[in-house]
């Protein structure tokens, strides 16, 4: 580990812990104020709507059901299942989004004609198309969890397409003309110039798409009647929210941590693969 990195890591860890501590304090302060003064705006504050954070942490180490494994054990297994679906969905969305961007980058006519439909695809609620995808793929004998991956890909391909297209079009026009003057083919220009130039833009999209893959998988699991993932756990604990709200909150925390984990993997991959990023990358 280099010396600058060795200095940055402890600072970032301390910053994360400090921010977490501040948020914890704000939560508990608002809980105390809300219960003490019986606040009803923006919502009624009580132990159901805002359970103490220490109760949420304690719930992770208590049995999820009588004589069963701990809630943390159950949620970790559910996280692995959802992570499998989301990882495949992310890969499908990334490959599909980049492929669409490559096609559109070769023709302004195609770009102007297809981009509006790409944008319009994101206005359709995932819950509306999830049953159609699950039933349609199920009729072909495809496993339900693969249908969930397809739905996760549906959420992830859009940012990849838009950013990849921007990256492919950001190649220096002078470099493109120089390669053409040496009779370079479109394929050579694409893979030797445009694709490397688009990497920073791609990873900007991947940082957005990775957590979206988790969201897509979790939302789609109930439509596929999958009980083994985080989506199934959320639906299950939602039925007992008025009695044990901390279980649902704990599930939400684990879901958020899984999304953060996917994001950090992308950040690590970016640091390993992208050496220099253009300053104007969003």
Where are each of the predicted segments found?
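Generic hydrophobic transmembrane alpha-helix motif, especially the helices
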Residues: 115, 119-159, 166-167
């Amino acid at each position: 580990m280099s010396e600058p990195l060795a200095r940055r890591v402890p600072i970032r860890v301390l910053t994360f812990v400090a921010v977490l501590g501040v948020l914890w304090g704000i939560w508990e302060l608002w809980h105390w104020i809300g219960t003490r003064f019986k606040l009803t705006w923006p919502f009624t504050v009580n132990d159901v709507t805002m359970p103490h954070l220490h109760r949420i942490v304690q719930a992770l180490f208590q049995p999820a059901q009588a004589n069963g494994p701990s809630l943390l054990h159950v949620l970790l297994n559910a996280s692995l299942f959802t992570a499998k679906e989301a990882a495949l969905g992310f890969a499908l969305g990334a490959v599909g989004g980049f492929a669409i961007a490559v096609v559109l980058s070769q023709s302004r006519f195609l770009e102007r004609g297809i981009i509006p439909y790409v944008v319009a695809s994101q206005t359709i609620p995932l819950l509306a198309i999830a049953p159609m995808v699950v039933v349609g793929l199920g009729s072909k004998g495809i496993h339900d969890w693969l249908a969930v991956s397809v739905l996760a890909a549906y959420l992830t391909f859009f940012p990849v397409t838009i950013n990849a297209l921007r990256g492919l079009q950001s190649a220096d026009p002078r470099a493109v003309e120089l390669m053409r003057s040496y009779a370079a083919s479109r394929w050579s220009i694409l893979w030797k110039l445009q694709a490397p130039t688009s990497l920073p833009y791609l990873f900007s999209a991947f940082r957005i798409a990775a957590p979206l893959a988790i969201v897509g998988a979790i939302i789609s699991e109930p439509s596929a009647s999958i009980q083994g993932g985080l989506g199934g756990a959320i639906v299950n604990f939602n039925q007992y929210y008025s009695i044990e709200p901390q279980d649902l909150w704990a599930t939400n925390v684990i879901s958020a941590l899984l999304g953060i984990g996917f994001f950090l993997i992308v950040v690590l991959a970016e640091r390993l693969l992208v050496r220099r990023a253009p300053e104007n990358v969003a």
